[in-house]
Amino acid sequence: VAVIGTGSSGIQSIPIIAEQADQLTVFQRTPNFSIPTHNGPIDEERLAEYRADPASYREEARHSGIGVPRTPPDTSALAVSEEERQAAFEAVWQRGELAFLQPFNDMGTNAEANDTMRGFIHDKIRSIVDDPEVAELLCPTDHYFATKRPCLDTGYFETFNLAHVRLVDLHADPISTITETGIDTSGRDGDESMEFDAIVFATGFDAMTGAIVGVDITGRDGLSLRDAWAHGPETYLGLMSVGFPNLFMITGPGSPSVLSNMMVSIEQHVDLITDTLEHLRDTNADTIEPTELAQTKWVQHSNDIANLTLLPTANSWYMGANIPGKPSVFLPYPGGVGAY
């Protein structure tokens, strides 16, 4: 089996495919950060916390940063000792939850602080993967930690210690042809033809906008949403767009969406949409859409917040950078669920 891609789809599927395939070859363009997910039963103490007051827990989630109740860290990664930093990072590694990935308050805004976490994960990869050359290939160096969506895995890095698993670096050995029987590469050390029974394309998604513009949505005066968003999506709150009366989106571009606990965001958006529909009914109005000014100010507000962070520095699907020709703009709202 060949797997092309080492983003979330590849990272989650590669360990399982390795259990079943006689030979697995992984073609990697860009290594990504991942931490072990530690799947298993939730411990009783945590369950008791959830069950003690579900209504308060859910209300806290609505006003939290990412839709999961937690106390935000108030300390810089650069203000503590190396021992304290390592202990905090180890706790993140052992917990394995996206909601608790940043134990310090400047991980997302300060490159030097972020580098401390990046170095910790690099060291973890080197300690797990037996072959030093393979380990270095698996260490992400082109983006800061969590500027692409971090992955959770079940033995991903350990998989590359298996004798029947091979990693191909596409920078050194790019794919030249997909053939009837497999994959041909042409690299620095010459050409190679590899035969496979199956090829898995774990090459990503047109995130945030692809599913929406994939539908032929037409607004006022025959304007298509695809054309309206040709230079990047523009919305008010990520829920409505100028020129498309009565078109509502849930977790659309310009909303917290993928930077949040999606269940909480979905509920918020459904509440706003139903409140809006009730208002239309109660005022005998037929249509609603945002003004140009409201939409422009919302887009600018979202961009201003993103530019305070390290998020726009990565060529990520948050930016639309994984799709050739797609405008590079920061797609989700980065200000947090509570602020939103």
Where does each model-flagged region fall?
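Hydrophobic/small residue at the entry helix of a nucleotide-binding pocket
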Residues: 9
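N-terminal FAD-binding dinucleotide-binding subdomain shared by FAD-dependent oxidases/monooxygenases
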Residues: 6, 20-340
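Aromatic pocket-lining residues of Rossmann-like dinucleotide-binding sites
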Residues: 13-17
